């Protein structure tokens, strides 16, 4: 089944917050971090947010930010029933294409060190380039539009 991205709006904030808290709560507890609804809401308001859909079903979301050199994936979460079905790989492909189309030099993200999604990111071409406490910083050079990632 095909996946699509649809622009998210403020009406999707509660879904995204709940999904992120559910998906990341284990890591917050593992690393003794404090979850903040207000912090999530503030971050959501300052980012470009996309819903991940499969046919007419909302299955996840991706949240982005940018600087002059890079497109950053700030959040990428899927509902439990839709994980390991190719959506994450598809979203990463879309984000590589977006970064190239915007002439960004890099696609970057951070991931909890114990999050198995790190393997997906590595399979898709991102490499660990540093660490910050409990996070790996990962990136991939985004080649020109004429290149095939």
What are these regions (language model features)?
Residues 89:
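Residues forming the Rossmann-fold NAD(P)(H) cofactor-binding site
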Residues 3, 7-81, 92-98, 117, ...:
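Acetyl-CoA-dependent GNAT
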Residues 121-122, 126:
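Conserved active-site tyrosine of GNAT-family acetyltransferases
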Residues 99-112:
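Conserved GNAT acetyl-CoA-binding A-motif
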């Amino acid at each position: 089944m095909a996946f699509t991205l649809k622009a998210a709006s403020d009406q999707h904030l509660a879904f995204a917050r709940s999904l992120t808290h559910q998906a990341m709560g284990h890591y917050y507890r593992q690393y003794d971090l404090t979850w903040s609804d207000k912090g999530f809401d503030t971050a959501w308001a300052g980012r470009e947010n996309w819903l991940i859909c499969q046919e007419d079903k909302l299955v996840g979301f991706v949240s982005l930010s940018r600087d002059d050199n890079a497109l950053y994936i700030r959040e990428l979460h899927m509902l439990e029933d839709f994980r390991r079905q190719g959506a994450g790989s598809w979203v990463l492909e879309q984000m590589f294409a977006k970064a190239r189309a915007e002439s960004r030099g890099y696609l970057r993200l951070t991931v909890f060190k114990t999050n198995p999604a790190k393997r997906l990111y590595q399979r898709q071409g991102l490499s660990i380039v540093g660490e910050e406490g409990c996070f790996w910083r990962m990136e991939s050079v985004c080649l020109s539009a004429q290149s095939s990632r």
